[in-house]
């Protein structure tokens, strides 16, 4: 398992932009991979922007939710 940061696709900008969001995954992802990431509004297009994110960089209040 590893932590990755993703950015969601923004149709208005026709780009993957905005804040990075952290997810835990067992998939062998690399930077630049395009994925479908779960959100409360359903799965959304996203791009992996960072892999192997250290737990120390994730807010401790969020870690149990990942």
Segments predicted by a language model, with ranges:
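Terminal, basic amphipathic appendages of nucleotide-handling enzymes
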Residues: 2-66
């Amino acid at each position: 398992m590893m932590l990755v940061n993703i950015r969601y696709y923004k149709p208005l900008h026709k780009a993957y932009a905005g804040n990075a969001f952290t997810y835990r995954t067992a998939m062998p992802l690399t930077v630049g991979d395009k994925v479908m990431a779960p959100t409360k509004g359903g799965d959304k297009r996203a791009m992996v922007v960072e892999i192997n994110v250290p737990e120390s960089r994730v807010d401790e209040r969020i870690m149990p939710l990942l």
